[in-house]
Amino acid sequence: MSKSHPRWRLAKKILTWLFFIAVIVLLVVYAKKVDWEEVWKVIRDYNRVALLSAVGLVVVSYLIYGCYDLLARFYCGHKLAKRQVMLVSFICYAFNLTLSTWVGGIGMRYRLYSRLGLPGSTITRIFSLSITTNWLGYILLAGIIFTAGVVELPDHWYVDQTTLRILGIGLLMIIAVYLWFCAFAKHRHMTIKGQKLVLPSWKFALAQMLISSVNWMVMGAIIWLLLGQSVNYFFVLGVLLVSSIAGVIVHIPAGIGVLEAVFIALLAGEHTSKGTIIAALLAYRVLYYFIPLLLALICYLLLESQAKKLRAKNEAAM
């Protein structure tokens, strides 16, 4: 069936509305899981300087994440305007954090980039590079912090300190292997399910690691500020890294419950009180997840309304 066929156009409209309704339903379900009275009480009681600093770092983090797609723009060689790339990246990241990688990382990227005129093969390369960049920074930081023994694990926990150090060494070996391939591999092209991927240069790989590592460190700094700076920053960052991989394994949208469980298990007691941890993470979820998601929803609707005009402009420029 031709893409210009009336039935095809109708099917696309129906699917778009079904997707939009599904997003609204997921938002409502997520909102019901949050104790909003406690959230606003926590925010009202926060030190204003710490809260404003945290808000500023949230903005910085989302801007840094936008650089992942700018790296992908350079990697793929597509000509979409940088502001369009940053906007799509912001929308996708906000949806990805709260509604899973399938919705934000994959679904939204394919939807928006295709609406702006990019072919599916290019979008696949953008997504692949973006997710690789994100986890390269994670692997590098986690490797350093786990190997250094910064995270103090309780005796009753699932893994011991030695296992975590071995894991850290393994992660650093992954980084070393990736850099070696980027620097010395002779065969730099690979095809995965019909999609051609090209191994980047070692300088590009270093840029991926640097940008992503800074983003993870900014995320850790947000929680550290909201905890009142009462705990060592690198310990907080290490706990965030542990909770992030736990969230991926459990695979719950927004890691609801996982983030809190890991932070309470590793921080509560001699480091800080359970109430302080819960309050900080409630504020973190509002600032880093929920408010950006609401803004992203508005941006998504605006971008959808302008997509046809922007696509025509992009195709003329290409």
Curated annotation (Swiss-Prot):
The record places the following residue ranges in the Cytoplasmic compartment, namely 35-50, 107-125, 187-205, 299-318
Tell me where the transmembrane regions lie.
14-34, 51-71, 86-106, 126-146, 166-186, 206-226, 234-254, 255-275, 278-298
Where in or outside the cell it occurs: the entry states:
Cell inner membrane
Q: Which residue intervals are topologically Periplasmic?
A: 1-13, 72-85, 147-165, 227-233, 276-277
Per its UniProt record, what InterPro entries does this chain match?
L-PG_synthase/AglD (IPR022791)
The record's GO CC annotations read: plasma membrane
Q: Which PANTHER family match?
A: UPF0104 MEMBRANE PROTEIN MJ1595 (PTHR39087:SF2)
UniProt-recorded name of the protein: Inner membrane protein YbhN
Q: Which organism is it from?
A: Escherichia coli (strain K12)
